[in-house]
Design a protein with these regions (language model features):
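Conserved ABC transporter NBD signature motif
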Residues: 56-67, 72
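Conserved ABC ATPase "signature" region
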Residues: 96, 106-121
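Hydrophobic anchor residue at the start of the ABC signature
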Residues: 139
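Catalytic Walker B motif of ABC-type/P-loop ATPase nucleotide-binding domains
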Residues: 150-154
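Conserved ABC ATPase signature
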Residues: 125-129
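H-loop/switch region of ABC-family ATPase nucleotide-binding domains
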Residues: 184-186
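Helix-to-loop junction immediately C-terminal to a conserved catalytic motif
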Residues: 48
Length: 234
């Protein structure tokens, strides 16, 4: 479980993006929905520890994300929309580093690269990769160590069709096995069938709907109702 307790956040010299957020993210697939710029990606950055809240506390399975940083973050994996990678490092070097960081054998990194069809490109540096290949490399790093919480910002963006299918199957398998998967996406239709909860983000506040209709069409219609026509979901 990821828990936000009275969390507020603002970027430097800007108004608050999030105001006194109280939120619990349980096992299963949770969709974050809301208009552009409402704070969805910021929520993921806070939950991953990339950003520090101005006020409040974030806990992962009861562990404070900052006071108990190492054990709390071991169970987290974060896929940013725009990966910031060292341009002259190779994919293999990046995955080897992640394996050392998570105290896992390097073979686990090789397996993750294979899953994303990157094994033959492992010698290439980041600057030689397309944006889609860079995102696949970061996604591969997310698999190392078998985390229990996945924070995915636009997980299908810039991915080939066959990779998208693999990602959707992987997400489905992880949610069924008890992982918590949180997704931000402009295209949520592929995830609707797997979703067990939704969080709306509007004007810096959040509201969680923990019980969604089981039927696909009813679930999609419910989510569209939450969106109030302000942004497309299909």
């Amino acid at each position: 479980m990821i828990r936000f307790h009275n969390v507020s956040f603002s970027y430097e010299k800007e108004e608050k993006v999030l105001h006194s957020v109280n939120l619990e993210i349980q096992a299963g697939l949770t969709l974050l929905i809301g208009p552009n710029g409402c704070g969805k990606s910021t929520l993921l950055k806070l939950a991953s520890g990339v950003e520090i809240p101005d006020e409040g506390r974030i806990a992962v399975d009861g562990l404070d994300l900052w006071k108990e940083e190492v054990p709390a973050r071991k169970s987290l994996a974060y896929l940013p929309e725009h990966p910031d990678l060292t341009p002259y490092a190779s994919i293999r070097e990046i995955l080897d580093f992640v394996c050392r960081l998570r105290e896992r054998p390097v073979e686990e990194g090789k397996k993750a690269l294979g899953f994303f069809d990157l094994g033959h490109l492992s010698h290439r540096t980041v600057r030689e990769l397309s944006m889609g290949q860079r995102r696949r490399a970061v996604f591969a790093a997310c698999l190392v160590g078998k985390p229990e919480h996945f924070l995915l910002d636009e997980p299908l963006e810039a991915m080939d069709r066959h990779i998208q299918k693999e990602i959707l199957a992987w997400i489905g398998g992880n949610t069924r096995s008890g992982a918590a998967v949180v997704i931000v996406s402009h295209w949520i239709e592929p995830f609707v069938d797997m979703a067990s909860a939704a969080v709306t983000v509007h004007n810096g506040s959040t509201f969680c709907f923990e019980s969604l209709p089981p039927d696909y069409e009813k679930k999609l219609a419910f989510l569209e109702q939450l969106a109030e026509g302000e942004y497309p979901l299909r």
